[in-house]
Swiss-Prot record:
The modification Phosphoserine is found at S339. It comes from Saccharomyces cerevisiae (strain AWRI1631) (Baker's yeast). This is Cell wall protein ECM33. Residues 361-401 have a biased composition (Low complexity). The keyword S-adenosyl-L-methionine does not apply. It comes from the Eukaryota. Glycans are attached at N21, N56, N82, N196, N209, N227, N234, N241, N267, N279, N304, N328, N389. Keywords: Cell membrane, Cell wall, Cell wall biogenesis/degradation, Glycoprotein, GPI-anchor, Lipoprotein, Membrane, Phosphoprotein, Secreted, Signal. The GPI-anchor is attached to the protein in the endoplasmic reticulum and serves to target the protein to the cell surface. There, the glucosamine-inositol phospholipid moiety is cleaved off and the GPI-modified mannoprotein is covalently attached via its lipidless GPI glycan remnant to the 1,6-beta-glucan of the outer cell wall layer. Residues 1-19 form the signal peptide. GO terms for cellular component: extracellular region; plasma membrane; side of membrane.
Amino acid sequence: MQFKNALTATAILSASALAANSSTSIPSSCSIGTSATATAQADLDKISGCSTIVGNLTITGDLGSAALASIQEIDGSLTIFNSSSLSSFSADSIKKITGDLNMQELIILTSASFGSLQEVDSINMVTLPAISTFSTDLQNANNIIVSDTTLESVEGFSTLKKVNVFNINNNRYLNSFQSSLESVSDSLQFSSNGDNTTLAFDNLVWANNITLRDVNSISFGSLQTVNASLGFINNTLPSLNLTQLSKVGQSLSIVSNDELSKAAFSNLTTVGGGFIIANNTQLKVIDGFNKVQTVGGAIEFTGNFSTLDLSSLKSVRGGAKFDSSSSNFSCNALKKLQSNGAIQGDSFVCKNGATSTSVKLSSTSTESSKSSATSSASSSGDASNAQANVSASASSSSSSSKKSKGAAPELVPATSFMGVVAAVAVALL
């Protein structure tokens, strides 16, 4: 073979070792060594008689179009990158890639066809500014990353049932996706795609982390548990309906969703870390969290809401801040919650458009914190205002963030206002 990296004796030995580990008997001509690089279609034609190749294959260089014929399995990875003249690629016989499928920096590639591909470890599609179609028959994959492409559809991933990572970001023509995913063991992210992105994950039962940004509509018809963090940030969602969700293991953030007018989490009972709802300008009535009983970190609600129903809340292990610009909002129920010792953190603040209550809580005694509330009102007010300024800055900064910032973080439960502010700041990165 006239691969750019010719097979040396060492490579042949490596190929033999790989072939020995394969479940299929591989002719020596189909073992390409630990890795090999093809720079022309003629290189690929020399392995066209193989049903399986062993080794990591890289395709790069000045190819106008390229195809892998007859090959059904790659026992290794396939990488196609940095080819300024490659306009199309097809490998419609491949059913399995044991390693990764990487497609990167292919500036005029318009189509990529893997019509029979059912199994791969990871797919990474990054910086494909001309691609419009990508086809597979994918059934099993661990990680999917699609970033900075012109894909109008990612339906090639619609039949997947479970993944570790599913990250779709910065694809400006992608406006919809309907998924069959049932579980996500690491992170699910959709961010900075088309202006009116509509998503449906109605088979998803559990996920470790979920972060959605710049989404117009979302459906989670079956979601019951999020093990770590759940975040809805900078979306144009008119409503959120997660009526099957019962537990968020760490942080829950609903921040800077300007069109959001209704949030229904009618079965949610537990938030293990920080719980923040902030800067959702149309969310005037917050009554969809009335079954929440425990918050493992701090809680902060900031906005223009007139109604807040947290009637089942029994325990907040961090501080609490409720700040509404509406003069119709009443702090009475929340002050009763605080006086009963349910707020276990270092501060309690409740404000509306007309009045403000600020109490510095003792970390050692609920009773002493009550008795010191009056004498320390002035100093605690100053401290609370300082914390409010920091928190407001963290919340408002999210409104200008329209880029994907990587996998959703697993946040440590916050134990104070500063903790929840730090948690949200990390979530917004």
